[in-house]
Amino acid sequence: MRLSVAAAISHGRVFRRMGLGPESRIHLLRNLLTGLVRHERIEAPWARVDEMRGYAEKLIDYGKLGDTNERAMRMADFWLTEKDLIPKLFQVLAPRYKDQTGGYTRMLQIPNRSLDRAKMAVIEYKGNCLPPLPLPRRDSHLTLLNQLLQGLRQDLRQSQEASNHSSHTAQTPGI
């Protein structure tokens, strides 16, 4: 028997649809990438940020090739809708990551959007000049697992105290 995750079964789809069609998806990704390069930190729904992350990383890889590389210039020209950001890609972002081979972005989940409860995320380029985001604590005492463990410990402590009390009264004879 083979266990598989339902999300891994794509039936020919290799990316999220995110919109009306393939052209709409590309326009959405281009606008998100442009915003990320301009502001170096944006927030959007989790699915869009997760889909855009690979393109943001690849754009930095092309930026590291330099503005004299024809393919890098074509990719920057295509993906950045605001052409004044092309020099920023080649002269600011690419030199920042010249010693890294990947992992240029950080993605954090933030509270859900209040209107439709959509799962939201923040994506940012690492090493930006913005104040750092607070990293979520993984092992909070409020998680379900930690609450269950705390209850188990209390039950064990109570049963040990009860058994100690009953064994203590059994050993001491009554007067």
Swiss-Prot record:
Keywords: Mitochondrion, Ribonucleoprotein, Ribosomal protein, Transit peptide. It comes from Homo sapiens (Human). Gene3D superfamilies: Ribosomal protein L17. This is Large ribosomal subunit protein bL17m. The gene is MRPL17. Pfam families: Ribosomal_L17. InterPro entries: Ribosomal_bL17, Ribosomal_bL17_sf. It comes from the Eukaryota. GO terms for molecular function: protein domain specific binding; structural constituent of ribosome. The keyword Membrane does not apply.
